[in-house]
């Protein structure tokens, strides 16, 4: 896949500032940047992108879901290569901001968000939701737990 862009970042920034959505689809087209450069006598060059996901468009919620699933697949793969166990990658979600130590086990349906950190050998139970918490090494988070370190403390 190739993307054509003006030769300099300054030209790209200037062209991006002029883009509009005055077309039948009401969308902004990056190709208009190349047309603008051409009309001004500027050169454009091709950037070869081997991974189409890095430049994939998103026009509706179905495409947004596809992009999110691909990002999550990559995040989980990275952690599994680092020694994290993921019982069911298709149902497990981990934000890019989460930090996992070696030998962490994530059971099906686990959702880890924000600045969550999970220590070595800890186990996160099925369908647990962790947001902005530190789980110590060797700890066991029970299934269906809801731990939110970002939530304000509430009085009883």
Name these PLM-found stretches.
Residues 84-86, 90-92, 98, 102-106, ...:
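A structural motif detector for beta-strand N-caps
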Residues 54-59, 92-98:
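Short, solvent-exposed polar/charged micro-motifs at secondary-structure junctions
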Residues 1-72, 77:
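Catalytic-core segments of class I nucleotidyltransferases/pyrophosphorylases
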Residues 27, 49, 79-82, 137, ...:
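Residue-level detector of alpha-helical recognition elements and their boundaries
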Residues 68-96:
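Long, charged amphipathic helices and adjacent flexible linkers at domain junctions
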Residues 7-11, 41-44, 83-84, 95-97, ...:
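Short amphipathic alpha-helical segments, especially helix-boundary/capping motifs
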């Amino acid at each position: 896949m190739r993307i054509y862009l003006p030769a300099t970042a300054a030209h790209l920034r200037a062209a991006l500032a002029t883009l509009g959505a005055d077309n039948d689809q009401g969308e902004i087209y990056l190709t208009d940047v190349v047309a603008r450069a051409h009309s001004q006598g500027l050169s454009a060059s091709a950037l070869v992108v081997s991974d189409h996901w890095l430049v994939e468009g998103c026009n509706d919620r179905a495409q947004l879901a596809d992009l999110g699933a691909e990002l999550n697949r990559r995040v989980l793969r990275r952690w599994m290569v680092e020694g994290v166990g993921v019982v069911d990658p298709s149902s497990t979600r981990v934000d890019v901001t989460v930090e996992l130590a070696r030998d962490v086990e994530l059971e099906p349906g686990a959702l880890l968000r924000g600045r969550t950190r999970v220590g070595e050998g800890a186990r996160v139970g099925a369908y647990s939701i962790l947001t902005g918490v530190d789980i110590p090494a060797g700890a066991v988070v029970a299934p269906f737990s809801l731990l939110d370190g970002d939530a304000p403390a509430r009085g009883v």
